[in-house]
Amino acid sequence: MDVAVESRVEPVGRIGVSRKVKAYISLTKPRVVELLLVTTVPTMILAARGIPNLWLVLATVVGGYMSAGSAGAFNCYIDRDIDRVMRRTKNRPLVTGELSDREALVFAWALGVASVLVLGFFTNWLAAGLSVAAILIYVVFYTLILKRRTTQNIVWGGVAGCMPVLIGWAVVTNSVGWAPVILFGVIFLWTPPHYWPLSMKYREDYKDAGVPMLAVVRGRAVVGLQVVLYAWAMVACSLLLIPVARMGVLYTAVALVAGGWFLYESHRLYNLAICHATVSPMRVFHGSIAYLTLIFLAVAIDPLLPF
């Protein structure tokens, strides 16, 4: 995999070991990886209807981090040209020169191969196969094909971010059932209300980089409406887990309350957008993270309760 890019990196002095390590970690997009792992472990607890084997959890977390980190590193390598244009990404290591293109590409491949081996040998090969699929979807389907061509880039590219729940379930059961499919659907429907508000804030960045995000092509009113529609579908999908996975009072209460709160925030964003008032898209962006965290905390705790 090689993408020709005109080099415009400012030369930097000799980089110390600690700074180099931090640059490699940054390449894996730790915040994104952290969010993915937040969905994996609760799914494993639900699949086991209790606390799964801790060594299995550790192997899954390590393998999952490597898998998501590999995808993130490939993404940084492929998108290094537009990262140099956007203010939001100007401090990434390939832009600053802390890492060379070759170092990033070798690191991405090494992490990807290591993730497959860790998941395959220490969990099972179904989980490893799903991990490979996640990397391919994010790198090829999203980064190479969709991102620069369509406003629906993050909708279908977001499939990669849904894979950890399938992987977590497969690790415990060596199969895929309806419960993880519903959780997959929740994350799939959550992705647009999460990322599109971000594109509203950084609209000019995406425009300058030539990335056709919905906020760039259609404007904030359309983004607000789409956020509302996806939010309603997401909340409805989250409620399907109650009968399918026999969820209890805690999950039901969290799904209803957190869902109602996020719907309110989504409608608020839309109403401000159509009234041409000042909007705070990052409020919905951060709210979406809080919502997903609460939902998966409930997924983890609910099976452990005696009622």
Swiss-Prot record:
Carbon 2 of the heme B porphyrin ring is defined according to the Fischer nomenclature. This is Protoheme IX farnesyltransferase. InterPro entries: Protohaem_IX_farnesylTrfase (IPR006369), UbiA_prenyltransferase (IPR000537), UbiA_prenylTrfase_CS (IPR030470), UbiA_sf (IPR044878). Converts heme B (protoheme IX) to heme O by substitution of the vinyl group on carbon 2 of heme B porphyrin ring with a hydroxyethyl farnesyl side group. The lineage of its organism: Bacteria, Bacillati, Actinomycetota, Actinomycetes, Micrococcales. Signal peptide: none annotated. GO terms for biological process: heme O biosynthetic process. The keyword Cell membrane applies. The chain crosses the membrane at residues 32-52, 54-74, 105-125, 126-146, 169-189, 222-242, 244-264, 287-307. The gene is ctaB. Coiled coil: none annotated. NCBIfam families: cyoE_ctaB, PRK04375.1-2. Disulfide bonds: none annotated. GO terms for cellular component: plasma membrane. Pathway: Porphyrin-containing compound metabolism; heme O biosynthesis; heme O from protoheme: step 1/1.
